[in-house]
Design a protein with these regions (language model features):
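Extracellular modular ligand-binding repeats in secreted and cell-surface proteins
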Residues: 240-270
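Surface-exposed interfaces of beta-sheet-rich extracellular modules
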Residues: 175, 179, 258-284
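Conserved ATP-binding subdomain of kinase catalytic cores across diverse folds
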Residues: 1-19
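Middle-to-C-terminal accessory/interaction subdomains
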Residues: 18-226
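Conserved "repeat-terminator" motif of extracellular CCP/Sushi domains
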Residues: 221, 285-297
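A short, amphipathic beta-strand motif
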Residues: 223-231, 235-239
Length: 297
């Protein structure tokens, strides 16, 4: 395994925890030689960096509005388990979003990334990738997918609330020993207030990020897409990278960035057609379709 780290605490120099840094620099140099206009760009880049993994990593950093990165808090690894492709790790995200962060839920992190130095190899994969149509399309749709699922407001808020519920019971003892033992009540009040502020930040973030993606990447708008299958239990429908467990299912995507929708029938059923709507005025008999969605459907 090659396990690498870069932080301000080590003079912002990439160093090897295990293995060597030279293979990373060799692969970064080879990546830089790729032509983003080539239709083979993604497949070639994927030989050096796990591209699916990398996109999810970038999305996480961006959704959390983390600006203590990409010059700091870098952790990279590769091994035989990754087919010797580099993967980036999330760490030290505490400076993203209020109440403790350098940014808040309104911060335009997409614009922040667009302004980064392409000589930084950790963000250059994204900067160069965004010049490639396949990468750009995937990044936008994958960001939409995650905001419709993993980063859905109800889910994120419930996770934070659960962590708060577990922690709050221990905090009086924490403050009594490690804080100000003469002012535990005020410290508890501050702790609860920070929880409420963080809940607000989480609840507002996705809406703001969608606006930033639309504005900064020149998209036409945001659309609600609803998918369903008839009869119930007849099969599954995959939109972009998401296969919802329950239907009807609604997610928000972007007008100006085509999305692939695929129907897969269960045993004993057959796909017949997509029903006509405002996008195609007659039924479509292809099980997999790629289309731009300009209005709510």
């Amino acid at each position: 395994i090659d396990l690498l780290s870069q932080s301000y605490w080590n003079n912002s120099v990439l160093r090897a925890i295990e293995g060597s840094v030279e293979p990373f620099y060799d692969d970064a140099q080879a990546f830089n030689a790729l032509d983003p206009a080539s239709p083979e760009f993604w497949d070639l880049a994927d030989q050096y960096f796990d591209m699916d993994w990398y996109v999810d990593y970038i999305i996480a950093e961006s959704w959390m509005a983390n600006t203590d990165w990409p010059g700091n808090n870098i952790r990279i690894y590769r091994s035989d388990k990754t087919n010797y492709r580099w993967r980036f790790c999330l760490l030290d995200m505490e400076l993203g979003l209020l109440p403790n962060g350098w940014t808040d839920c309104y911060f335009d992190h997409i614009n922040h990334m667009l302004g980064q130095d392409p000589n930084n190899p950790y963000i250059n994969v994204w900067l160069k990738g965004m010049q490639n149509p396949r990468f750009r399309n995937y990044f936008i749709n994958r960001f939409a997918d995650l905001m419709n699922t993993s980063y859905k407001i109800e889910r994120i808020s419930a996770i934070e609330q659960s962590m708060f519920n577990q922690t709050v019971l221990e905090m009086p003892r924490e403050y009594s020993r490690w804080g100000d033992p003469n002012n535990v009540a005020q410290q508890m009040t501050d702790f609860v207030n920070r929880h409420h502020e963080f809940q607000f930040q989480l609840s507002e973030r996705t809406g703001q990020v969608r606006n930033h993606i639309q504005a900064d990447l020149g998209l036409n708008g945001q659309v609600e897409v609803t998918i369903d299958a008839f009869p119930a239990g007849a099969g599954t429908i995959k939109i972009s990278t998401v296969t919802p467990d329950a239907r009807p299912w609604t997610g928000v995507y972007f007008d100006g960035n085509p999305v692939v929708i695929t129907a897969t029938p269960n045993p004993g059923y057959a796909f017949v057609y997509w029903d006509a709507n405002s996008i195609f005025t007659s039924p479509d008999f292809n099980a997999s379709i790629e289309l731009n969605i300009p209005t709510d459907e």
